[in-house]
Amino acid sequence: MFLSYSLEAGMKVRSFPLVQEAELRALIAEGAEVEIVCLHEADKEARNRGEWIILVHRAEGERLVLVSSRSKHRIFLRFEGLCAYAAHTLELGEIHIPMREGESCRGMYHRDRQPRTR
């Protein structure tokens, strides 16, 4: 699926191709890198409610954004839900989550393909 999605984080507008969960999981299992982007800063008063999206980086340098089965962008609203999805559904070896709007964290891989740094 190669529709485009406009992401507005601060003043920057980016357009990424879309990927559904099944293809995303396959890409990650093959060794693709995962990035999590914070769209709206987590609110401590609201039990860490914020907004995050997940991107995957293909080997060709292309970035794809996760969408639901209905081609709607998948935005995670709760920190806990994002952690559970990344750990159990995507089976990431480690999870890094940005907490400030506009920030992102990269370098996450499938737990069986995690580069050994230690």
Region spans (language model):
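Mixed-charge, polar/low-complexity N-terminal
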Residues: 8-9, 14, 56, 76-78
